[in-house]
UniProtKB/Swiss-Prot annotation:
Its EC number is 6.3.2.-. Keywords: Ligase. This is Probable indole-3-acetic acid-amido synthetase GH3.1. Pfam families: GH3 (PF03321), GH3_C (PF23572), GH3_M (PF23571). The keyword Oxidoreductase does not apply. InterPro entries: GH3, GH3_C, GH3_M. The lineage of its organism: Eukaryota, Viridiplantae, Streptophyta, Embryophyta, Tracheophyta. One of its GO terms (biological process) is response to light stimulus.
Length: 610
């Protein structure tokens, strides 16, 4: 069968033009033969991981037909079911628990368990699969957009804080792992992977210095930029907001050819110094655009050759589409790839489609896919694995939860993404992203569910007790109108005998933040990708008005209960019209790298072995 170029020759975002046909042929082959490829992938995974303790528990190795045994015997599993074994590895156990190959590092998920990032064990070979998927992006995009090899890409990419487990393995986000890999740093010279950002700026852990250096280099290369982007829409908008605040300083650097002294990282200064030259005319041109009263269309005005904005705008990121369209001035928004910490999955074969039409084709070589119909009775993992549907057997228009078995050693793992079948590429389905299971609030990579939010609010309202006040009802929404976005809580209170000071409401804001998960707190305290949490106190009777509105729209009065999360629109307008006070968290919540659950690993392992 034809193969896409190996990771040793595949650059991060595409090939030289001569290899595009080979990449497209690879996509055509694996999608046309999706069923056969999937059977081969499952066989390879089970053969590679035959020594794994996890598979031995279910009697898979040694069975006459391991694939049949896997289908019959291995149950569905969530992260919580794997956590005792994961913590064994984190604590230094090097035995083959999940994989026949050594665990090379942990990838920290944006999803959380017990308030901490989930730790996804991975093997070194997985980096080659990720690189292969990246290598397919430009061949696909070049079918829709020509001339992308005639200039540069301004991608704003960042690393995040990482830590070491007690056993010495790195624990870091999947993109941080990729940007630090030899596959990214040693990528061959290629006209499709010419970036404005120096690697040194991307790898700078100081987010301010990294952002400043990357934007400065992007402005210096203004005339050459053909595409702009970031991973998430929220991250790209943070960059625009940063530019709004600092464009005068950036123009000064370009005018003088001298980098701002606040950029103190020597490696970054040296890298930018190789790009920056005094150019008063360029500084004047940028200044003229940035000094205008309106920033509508600023992307197209600052980078006039840009053909599209490459960011994720599916799922919760769709809330940023209007703002992106304002700044983009009509530039297409492209979604190119579907991936997670567990595994990289697929790509959008029609990347220039409207955001509402984005559908991802799952590449059958990446892992073994199964799908759990969202309407089936899946209350227990033991029963629900019998309801799983193979990749080639899903039905158009139906919704499924994604379940994966990976080379790294996840077996029938519930990713938590709900997907809808939107069409087919040959025998391989194309999926639109519907939602993340059990997520109430999200403005960046954070994911907060209703249970976590309720516990945080319940703790925070204790600050009101000395004043005789109590919480009648509350709801929340993710406000994407601010940059960065932030959580808003609407509280209706029963007043006490003493007025509650503003400082107490601010303490309530901080208390909620302190009780939220580590991904949220990192976004607030370290990455500054989330703004201060806000409490809006509404007038008495507001939630009665909200119920009246819901009933007028067809809700049952017998079954109605106040929603814990609402979306921008008429409901938020109703709530905002009755706001009596607004209060913000006065400082960032505490956060530090690492995982508090590592200290509990022995207890958890004991429970898991029982």
């Amino acid at each position: 069968m034809p193969e896409a170029p190996t990771a040793k020759t595949a650059p991060a975002y595409g090939y030289a033009p001569g290899a595009h046909a080979e990449a497209l042929e690879f996509i055509e082959h694996v999608t046309a033969n999706a069923g056969q490829v999937q059977r081969r992938v499952l066989g390879e995974i089970l053969a590679q991981n035959a020594p794994a303790e996890y598979l031995r528990r279910y009697g898979i190795p040694g069975s006459p037909d391991v694939v049949d045994a896997f289908r019959r015997l291995v149950p569905l599993v969530t992260y919580e079911g794997l956590q005792p074994d994961i913590l064994r590895i984190a604590n230094g156990d090097t035995s083959p628990i999940f994989s026949g190959k050594p665990i090379s590092e942990f990838l920290t998920s944006s999803g959380t368990s017990g308030g901490e990032r989930k730790l996804m064990p991975t093997i070194a070979d997985e980096m080659n699969r990720r690189s292969l998927l990246y290598s397919l992006l430009m061949p696909v995009m070049s079918q829709s957009v020509s001339g992308l090899d005639k200039g540069k890409a301004m991608y704003l990419l960042f690393v995040k804080a990482e830590s070491r487990t007690p056993g010495g393995l790195a624990a870091r986000p999947v993109l941080t792992s990729y940007y630090r890999s030899r596959q990214f740093l040693d990528r061959p010279r290629d006209p499709y992977t010419s970036y404005t950002s120096p690697d040194e700026a991307i790898l700078c852990v100081d987010s301010y210095q990294s952002m400043y250096a990357q934007l400065l280099c992007g402005l210096v290369h203004r005339a050459d930029v053909l595409r702009v982007g970031a991973v998430f829409a929220s991250g790209f908008l943070r960059a625009i907001h940063f530019l709004e605040k600092h464009w005068a300083r950036l123009c000064h650097d370009i005018r003088t050819g001298e980098l701002d002294p606040e950029i103190t990282d020597r490696v970054v200064r040296d890298a930018v110094g190789r790009v920056l030259r005094a150019d008063p005319a360029l500084a004047d041109a940028i200044e003229d655009e940035c000094a205008r009263a309106s920033w509508e269309g600023i992307i197209r005005r600052l980078w006039p050759r840009t053909k599209y904005i490459d960011v994720i705008v599916t799922g919760t990121m769709s809330q940023y589409i209007p703002t992106l369209e304002f700044y983009g001035g009509g530039l297409p928004l492209t979604c190119t790839m579907y991936a997670s910490s567990e595994c990289y999955f697929g790509l959008n074969l029609n990347p220039m489609c409207k955001p509402s039409d984005v559908a991802y084709t799952l590449i059958p070589t990446m892992c073994y896919y199964e799908f759990l119909p969202v309407n089936c009775n899946n209350a227990t993992a033991e029963a629900s694995h019998r309801d799983l549907v193979d990749l080639v057997d899903v039905k158009l228009g139906h919704e499924y939860e994604l379940v994966v078995t990976t080379y790294s050693g996840l077996y029938r793992y519930r990713v938590g993404d709900v997907l809808r079948v939107a069409g087919f590429k040959n025998k391989a389905p194309m999926f639109s992203f519907v939602r993340r299971q059990n997520v109430a609030l999200s403005v960046d990579s954070d994911k907060t569910d209703e249970t976590e939010l309720h516990a945080a609010v319940s703790g925070a309202v204790q600050h009101l007790a000395p004043f005789g006040a109590s919480l009648v009802e509350y709801t929340s929404y993710a406000d994407a109108a601010t940059i960065p976005g932030h959580y808003v809580l609407f509280w209706e209170l029963r007043a006490g005998s003493t007025a509650v000071p503003a400082s107490v409401f601010e303490e309530c804001c901080l208390s909620v933040e302190e009780a939220l998960n580590s991904v949220y707190r990192q976004g607030r305290a370290c990455d500054r990708s989330i703004g201060p949490l806000e409490i809006r106190v509404v007038a008495e009777g507001t939630f009665d008005k909200l119920m009246d509105y819901a009933i007028s729209r067809g809700a049952s009065i017998n079954q109605y209960k106040a929603p814990r999360c609402v979306r921008p629109g008429p409901v938020v307008e109703l709530l905002d019209a009755r706001v009596q006070g607004k209060y913000f968290s006065p400082k960032c919540p505490k956060w530090s790298p690492g995982n508090k659950q590592w200290n509990k690993s022995k207890d958890l392992v004991g429970k898991g072995d029982a």
